[in-house]
A protein has these predicted regions:
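PLP-dependent amino-acid enzyme catalytic core
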Residues: 1-416
Length: 416
């Protein structure tokens, strides 16, 4: 298990390599939650993610012989960028395995940072499948595997985020009640928690997971890491089916509690951060800020620091994020409604069912021959989310057999 001293040693190596990212007071969030909120902006790191820290330090610690043979890694994106950047700087070969579901923006960034020293292999639908292929390749080629989280040197490198936070807080004359840390495989929180509990043991360390990928919560509940059969890959940077053995043992010892944050709330937060203060975060990076909403009643008057772990957001995903945010906020809803197959039925629906400022966002209709009614897939955006119950009452009067797709996970997921 790593110690705070290991993190100090890692910082000596990394201080001339990585950016000492900003620790900024956030006036908007502070006023919103009645607290003093600071943001550690790892989205401003050289590869727009904290992952450079662990990757660089782990590779730096290899022997010259191991460096010459080359390294292998598996990553959903950010760890791969850290490895690629490092190998380009050190002029050593790297083979990087990425899930086929990885956003194109992250794949392109890996190529950019790695240049001629990196070969990319897209394998598997999840990180875990990609990691298994990478492990097999490592053995067959006699190279060194750089684990994205379950490695003590990687954890020590990630822990330098906490080293900087504590150092910057002292310079500002600030002390924190709690620190909110995104959790995927556990590399960041294991490093952060190790250092924080050594230098500021009274500070609460809170891990934040996406609700659809709570692998650390599952490990806490079972007493050991377990593999989740299915995960929501929306927050891809923290969507991990199974946490590491080494990261779990550190988290179990030092992390005070874990929170789950709905992917819709993450989307809403990500959009809010961009529109209000111009901060660009990826879903995983926004998770810690989203968690403020979950604990808003208990943080009033307190001083909190949130780590924005990354800012590698694919602009092509914004429509999905907007959709998730609207659904989470209770604005957008989907239904299957049987419409009378006669002229004027749609006008009647709009006049009788929708409020004056409500909107139809989706309308798919297939006319049925020789039938009095035909099913319509309809999306409705409410002007006031509090009118939801009234909408359901009016829908029931229009079609008692209507289907609310919010209760049908399979169909609902096809739309979002």
């Amino acid at each position: 298990m790593i110690t705070a001293n290991d993190i100090v040693k890692a910082n000596e190596v990394l201080k001339n390599v990585v950016e000492r990212t900003q620790l900024d007071f956030d006036r908007y969030l502070s006023e919103k939650y009645g607290a003093t909120i600071y943001i550690k902006k790892e989205n401003m790191q050289k590869v727009r993610s904290f992952k450079l820290r662990g990757a660089y330090y782990a590779i730096h610690q290899l022997s010259d012989e191991d460096k010459a043979r080359g390294v292998v890694c598996a990553s959903a994106g950010n760890h791969a960028q850290g490895v690629a950047y490092t190998c380009n700087e050190m002029k050593i070969p790297a083979t990087i395995f990425m899930p086929v579901t990885t956003p194109l923006q992250k794949i392109g960034q890996v190529r950019f940072f790695g240049g001629k020293f990196v070969t990319i292999k897209l394998v598997g639908d999840t990180f875990d499948a990609s990691a298994q292929a990478a492990q097999e390749y490592t053995k067959s080629e006699g190279m060194t595997f750089i684990d994205p989280f379950d490695d003590y040197n990687v954890q020590a490198g990630q822990g330098t985020v906490a080293y900087e936070i504590y150092e910057q807080a002292q310079e500002e004359g600030v002390s924190f009640d709690s620190i909110l840390v995104p959790v995927g495989g556990g590399g960041l929180i294991s490093g952060v928690a190790t250092y924080i509990k050594d230098v500021a043991p009274s500070m609460e360390v809170i891990g934040v997971e996406a609700s659809g990928a709570r692998s650390m919560r599952a490990a806490f509940d079972r007493g050991y890491p377990v593999k989740l059969e299915e995960i929501d890959k929306f927050a891809d940077g923290i969507a991990v089916q199974k946490v590491g053995v080494k990261t779990y043992e550190v988290a179990r010892k030092y992390v005070d509690r874990l929170l789950g944050v709905d992917e819709g709330l993450i989307s809403e937060t990500l959009i809010d951060m961009y529109s209000k203060v111009g901060t660009i975060a990826e879903p995983a990076g926004a998770a810690s800020v989203a968690a403020l909403e979950v604990i808003k009643d208990e943080i009033k008057g307190k001083t909190i620091v949130c780590i924005i772990s990354g800012g590698n957001n694919d602009i092509n995903r914004m429509p999905e994020m907007e959709e998730r945010a609207l659904i989470y906020d209770g604005i957008k809803h989907y239904f299957v409604v049987n419409f009378p197959q006669r002229p004027g039925a749609l006008r009647e629906f709009v006049n009788d069912i929708l409020g004056p400022n409500d909107d139809i966002t989706r309308f798919e209709y297939i006319k049925r021959a020789n039938k009095g009614k035909g099913p319509v897939l309809i999306g409705i955006a409410l002007s006031d989310k509090n009118d939801y119950d009234g909408l359901l009452e009016r829908l029931s009067a229009f079609d008692p057999s209507y289907i609310n797709l919010h209760g049908n996970e399979t169909l609902y997921n096809m739309l979002v």
